[in-house]
Amino acid sequence: MKNFKSFKNMVSVDMTKTNYTILPQNVADNGVLKGCIFVGANASGKSTIILSVKLLLDFLFSERNLNSGIFLCMFGDSPTYSLAYDFLIKGHSIHYCFEVDTRISMISEKLLMDDYLMLERMGVSAKSYIADTDGISYDENDVGKDTLFLRTLYFNT
């Protein structure tokens, strides 16, 4: 996450196991932790980290406006905030990220699977390689200005 809520600089949370040997049952077969806890002082960002994960679910599965300035870092100089997510699912590396420019109401998105581009969006134009390796182009008639294009593809297929 970058320029998101109280995090001005890029912050990353890595759920890959380390060499600790305690709680081996907390590690999945693929080397990813099954869970974690966040511990820290008041107002240190614990809830913001959890919010960044919750927002992905909200943006994908419920009606939520991305262009809202409420997610913008109050200490930042930029009108954009970004969130990126990396998953390991059935041996496939999934990278999904989006950036919101609240000043000009523009969203950019990118989805990669095993480093292959699957979806790309800039503003109200997008291209998906999920169903067709040559790509299917979409324009303002298909791409919502304030919602994730990945959500649109999911609910329209």
Mark where each language-model region is.
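Intrinsically disordered, low-complexity boundary segments flanking structured domains
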Residues: 1-2, 72-73, 134-139
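Pre-Walker A-like glycine/lysine-rich segment at the N-terminus of P-loop NTPase domains
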Residues: 1-54
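A generic structural motif
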Residues: 2-4, 86-90, 112-114
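Short loop/turn segments at connectors of secondary-structure elements within structured domains
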Residues: 7-9, 92, 105
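Ser/Thr- (and often Asn-) enriched beta-sheet segments in non-cytosolic proteins
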Residues: 12, 86, 93-95, 108, ...
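Residues in well-ordered beta-strands of folded domains
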Residues: 14-16, 86, 99, 151
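Conserved P-loop NTP-binding catalytic core
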Residues: 31-37, 41, 50-103
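Electropositive, glycine-dotted interaction segments
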Residues: 97-157
